């Protein structure tokens, strides 16, 4: 692509994302499907704005690369060792069983057995990018099914290496094209990368961090990710696997959170680009001429993978309420199929339109997953939120709730337990199925689903409740829920969790005055203990804490008008100096006053 063409393509991608994703969210079909539809619209089979799909698709794989790096940062080697049973047990079983069944069906569809084997392996893989994105949206990350899903995806990435090595063997060209010496050199280079990364990455980042320049740290992070991806690509291996390993090597370093913050903005944009590229690659011409074949293939692919995954989840001991989510989120074909099928095509394994048919099947199967997840979500909501048939009902089952608590993570649990201990009637909304089942055992009245849906709020008793406590992890969900409550349930007294000052400003601007910054109170308490440890009298330390809390809240409110202004930083510095002066003046004034505790303690 020329420079001007690349810039034009970038503008088209951004326009497609900005136009399609909000529309998809309004229709309730999810951001991923919105990206796919946007890609179809601007691709060669849509409006035809972009025709060089292969080059863009290869570049857009960087979205998956960045995603795998961040996942690697969240896992250390000891954690991977703990997951070995699910990775090499369930993951291997899923790939082998699905590939065997699908290969057999492809042979019945007049594929040569060599092409059927490659096709079965490619179709057995799932989309890492789509599955992880949907698991995050559905709150599956913390659940047992989410952890098992990640293990399966990780094994699939590991399976890339032998699958690519298998293609020339099946093509009957092993003697000409398969050089065992080159394979050995690739393995050696991979081992050198592991050893070098283990002992060099942390000292290098320590040296870079010592410069104190944030931009250099971000540049070094990008250099690491892109270099690892390029190195693995040069070896003929999975780029995503290379960056995942780099992330794991840095998972126990002191720079883990800084690395994640540096990469996160690029990850989101490039993942969107990847899904748009997949939509662009959909060959509508093949779809029109082989409509029944493609439709049957998509249904068979999804059903076989779901049945296989459901059976494995049952054998692994996953709760029945989580099995359908686990099976559906991994039921699609994956991005690896594009690479594997292209390699097989270069070895002349496929005949006629076989490769095009397989790629259309993979693309359409990816489009079915968000819709399938949405349908299963509704089914689970009806099943879990309906009247219970057993006699073990919570003690508040027939009462209208006084308070609705949204989210039952560590923050929400403390609030719910406090309210229950004081005999308040509460209803909890939670989208983690495992947490829902556990809470019901302890007598909580709980509804499963997305709290940003008005129907769920109404079913949970929002019209009769007095207050709603919002403890969502994502600030976007919190603000959307605040807007919904103000629009549909204006009588509700809204109390919310704020992750920091930025979220607190947004809540204040939305009219929510009752909120708690999750780390502020605990930090103040630890600060009070620090003052006492330095020799300050406990009562004086308590007063210092109260003064700081009051003055900090005042400054927080005063800075609201300038929250989005360029002068915010200078105003914040001025406010900090003012706070210090007022704090010192008031503390000196109180020290002159006699206090019974100070005098006689």
From Swiss-Prot:
One of its GO terms (cellular component) is plasma membrane. InterPro entries: Cation/H_exchanger_TM, K/H_exchanger, K_H_efflux_KefB, K_uptake_TrkA, Na+/solute_symporter_sf, NAD(P)-bd_dom_sf, RCK_N. Gene3D superfamilies: 1.20.1530.20, NAD(P)-binding Rossmann-like Domain. GO terms for molecular function: glutathione-regulated potassium exporter activity. Residues 400-519 form the RCK N-terminal domain. It is found in: Cell inner membrane. Keywords: Antiport, Cell inner membrane, Cell membrane, Ion transport, Membrane, Potassium, Potassium transport, Transmembrane, Transmembrane helix, Transport. The keyword Transmembrane helix applies. GO terms for biological process: proton transmembrane transport. It is a multi-pass membrane protein. The chain crosses the membrane at residues 4-24, 29-49, 55-75, 87-107, 111-131, 152-172, 177-197, 207-227, 230-250, 262-282, 284-304, 324-344, 356-376. NCBIfam families: 2a37 (TIGR00932), PRK03659.1 (NF002973). Belongs to the monovalent cation:proton antiporter 2 (CPA2) transporter (TC 2.A.37) family. KefB subfamily. Pore-forming subunit of a potassium efflux system that confers protection against electrophiles. Catalyzes K(+)/H(+) antiport. Interacts with the regulatory subunit KefG. PANTHER family: K(+) EFFLUX ANTIPORTER 3, CHLOROPLASTIC (PTHR46157:SF4). This is Glutathione-regulated potassium-efflux system protein KefB. It comes from Salmonella enteritidis PT4 (strain P125109).
């Amino acid at each position: 692509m020329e420079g001007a063409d690349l810039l034009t393509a970038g503008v088209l991608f951004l326009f497609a994302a900005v136009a399609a994703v909000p529309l998809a969210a309004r229709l309730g079909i999810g951001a991923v499907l919105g990206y796919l539809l946007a890609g179809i619209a601007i691709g060669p089979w849509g409006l035809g704005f972009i025709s060089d799909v292969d080059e863009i698709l290869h570049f857009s794989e960087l979205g998956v690369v960045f995603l795998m790096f961040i996942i690697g940062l969240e896992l250390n080697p000891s954690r991977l060792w703990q997951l070995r049973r699910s990775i090499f047990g369930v993951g291997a079983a899923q790939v082998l069983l699905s590939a065997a069944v699908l290969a057999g069906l492809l042979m019945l569809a007049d594929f040569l057995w060599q092409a059927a084997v490659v096709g079965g392996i490619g179709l057995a893989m799932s989309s890492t990018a789509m599955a992880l994105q949907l698991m995050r949206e559905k709150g599956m990350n913390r659940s047992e099914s989410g952890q098992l899903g990640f293990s399966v995806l990780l094994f699939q990435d590991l399976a890339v290496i032998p699958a690519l090595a298998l293609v020339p063997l099946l093509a009957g060209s092993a003697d000409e094209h398969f050089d065992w010496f080159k394979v050995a050199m690739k393995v050696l280079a991979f081992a050198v990368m592991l050893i070098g990364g283990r002992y060099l990455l942390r000292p290098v980042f320590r040296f870079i961090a010592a410069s104190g320049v944030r931009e250099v740290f971000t540049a070094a992070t990008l250099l690491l990710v892109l270099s690892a991806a390029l190195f693995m690509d040069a070896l003929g291996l999975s780029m995503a696997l290379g960056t995942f390993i780099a992330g794991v090597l840095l998972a126990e370093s002191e720079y883990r959170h800084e690395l994640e913050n540096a990469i996160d903005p690029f990850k989101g944009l490039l993942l969107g680009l990847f899904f748009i590229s997949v939509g662009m690659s959909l060959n509508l011409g093949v779809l029109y001429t082989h409509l029944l074949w493609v439709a049957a293939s998509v249904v068979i692919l999804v059903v076989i993978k779901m049945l296989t995954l459901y059976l494995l989840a049952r054998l692994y001991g996953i709760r029945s309420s989580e099995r359908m989510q686990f099976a559906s989120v991994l039921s699609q074909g994956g991005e690896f199929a594009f690479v594997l099928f292209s390699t097989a095509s270069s070895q002349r394994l496929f005949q006629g339109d076989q490769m095009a048919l397989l790629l259309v099947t993979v693309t359409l199967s990816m489009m079915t997953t968000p819709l399938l997840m949405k349908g299963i979500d509704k089914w689970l909501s009806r099943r879990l939120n309906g009247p219970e048939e057993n006699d073990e009902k919570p003690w508040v089952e027939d009462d209208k709730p006084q308070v609705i608590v949204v989210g039952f993570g560590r923050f929400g649990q403390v609030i719910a337990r406090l309210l229950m201990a004081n005999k308040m009637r509460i209803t909890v909304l939670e989208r983690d199925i495992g947490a829902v089942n556990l809470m019901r055992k302890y007598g909580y009245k709980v509804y499963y689903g997305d709290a940003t849906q008005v129907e769920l709020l109404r079913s949970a008793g929002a019209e009769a409740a007095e207050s709603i406590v919002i403890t969502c992890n994502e600030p976007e969900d919190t603000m959307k829920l605040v807007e919904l409550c103000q629009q549909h349930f204006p009588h509700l007294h809204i109390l919310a969790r704020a992750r920091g000052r930025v979220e607190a400003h947004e809540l204040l601007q939305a009219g929510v005055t009752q909120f708690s910054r999750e780390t502020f109170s605990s930090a103040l308490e630890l600060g009070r203990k620090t003052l006492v440890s330095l020799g300050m009298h406990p009562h004086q330390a308590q007063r210092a804490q109260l003064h700081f809390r009051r003055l900090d809240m005042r400054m927080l409110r005063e800075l609201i008008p300038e929250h989005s202004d360029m002068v915010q930083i200078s105003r914040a510095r001025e406010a900090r100096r003012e706070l210090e002066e007022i704090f010192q003046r008031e503390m000196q004034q109180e020290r002159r006053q006699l206090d019974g505790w100070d005098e006689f303690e």
